[in-house]
């Protein structure tokens, strides 16, 4: 999947990615990152079921 980083807080270690095509927001934790990300970055990611729903994992900048 692809999307855009809407928000990421380095200090707290989490943020949100907006999925391309349907504008769904997905939670991303710092542990799910392959690359460092910043707001506005275009990324590829996978979704994995977490405690509170789907989380973005294996996130890398494209």
Predicted regions, residues:
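Well-ordered beta-strand positions in beta-sheet-rich domains
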Residues: 2, 25-27, 42
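OB-fold/S1-family single-stranded nucleic acid-binding modules
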Residues: 48-62
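Structural detector for short beta-strands of small beta-barrel domains
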Residues: 1-7
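Short aromatic-glycine-enriched beta-strand elements
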Residues: 12-17
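Beta-strand/loop nucleic-acid-binding surfaces
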Residues: 23-35
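Short nucleic-acid-contacting surface segments enriched for D/E, G, S/T with interspersed K/R
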Residues: 33-44
